[in-house]
Amino acid sequence: MSSVGDFEEIILHDLKPYYHVPGAIHSEGITFVKETGTLLWVDIFKGEVHKVEDIEQPESSHSFFSISRANYGKNASIEYPPNPDELKESVGCIFPILDGASQNEIKQVLFGSKFGIGKLDFSKSEWEYVILYSECPELSTDRAYKLRSNDGNVSPDGKYIYVGLMSDFPFDLEPIGCLLRVDLLAHKIELVWNCLLIPNAIHWDESDQKTMYVTDSLNFTIWKCPGGDLLKRDELIDVKNSNNQSFESPEPDGSAIWFSKDGKHSGFLFITVWSTSKVQMFDLTNGKLLKEFILPEQTPRVSCCCFVGKDLFVTTANAEINDAVRTNTDKNGGCIYKIPNVLDGNVPLESTKRQPLH
């Protein structure tokens, strides 16, 4: 359904990083929390949860927590799952919790990790699983063991966490990934989309709060699912054929959705396109490419984005994610960019993810 006609190209080759954590490998899942002014993101490969409490002063307000077996809660209600190969923890996506948050500080988050949905308490410096993916009836134990969390989001009513799983780093990439729907209150997990390679960003249409937009990275496709019916999906955007034909694998990765408050626009999707240094803006009505933001060529692995008011924050990944021996030649990948004034007009600050019921 997508089309490529006239579109605007915005060259940002001289843009400097907003912030770069030393040693960052795969920054992802960037999220803004309006209530506390907090910017959150993860490093998937290193299994880290990062936060900046003062966006204007990231150097002085940045902190992070490394998820590992060693700091798993001693009194956790769920025992740490069997891990005979001692696979590393990873963190694919993050969901803020406002319960107990002060005016300017997030104290707890939920997150998609290696074996399930975890909960981190920054004040206690420990974490625990609140539900395991192996509890999903449709997932065998062996299959669940080979998977890890990728991207995810919270349904408009807050009831469900939708999280995509894909092959974990030590394993070959296979179509054993899936999309799960997690109900934390009922302690229930359902498999709602099977046999995926890399499920990615998930959004809902603001008009009906039901229609879903789901990213299928290695099919280079954004699917539109009217009424939230994942079985009745229509191709909305063909990313590979949206001015990306010159790239070997221009995979749509994380994205940000925006709906105007004046009713003049039906909505736009801003997609980070892995391996291209691009963020592309599409019209949700017809899948038409409207703009391209071309980031510095030193960081082709753009991975996710979110809005803070008018500004778009973009995460990137390092060139050496899966390398057994790191040469540390990539000094740029893993940084975060801030593209100013991407949106026009009076744009209020809004949180980019809902708090899930838990």
UniProtKB/Swiss-Prot annotation:
Gene3D superfamilies: TolB, C-terminal domain. Pfam families: SGL (PF08450). SUPFAM superfamilies: Calcium-dependent phosphotriesterase. GO terms for molecular function: calcium ion binding; gluconolactonase activity. It comes from the Eukaryota. Present with 4190 molecules/cell in log phase SD medium. PANTHER family: REGUCALCIN. Belongs to the SMP-30/CGR1 family. This is Uncharacterized protein YBR053C. It comes from Saccharomyces cerevisiae (strain ATCC 204508 / S288c). The lineage of its organism: Eukaryota, Fungi, Dikarya, Ascomycota, Saccharomycotina.
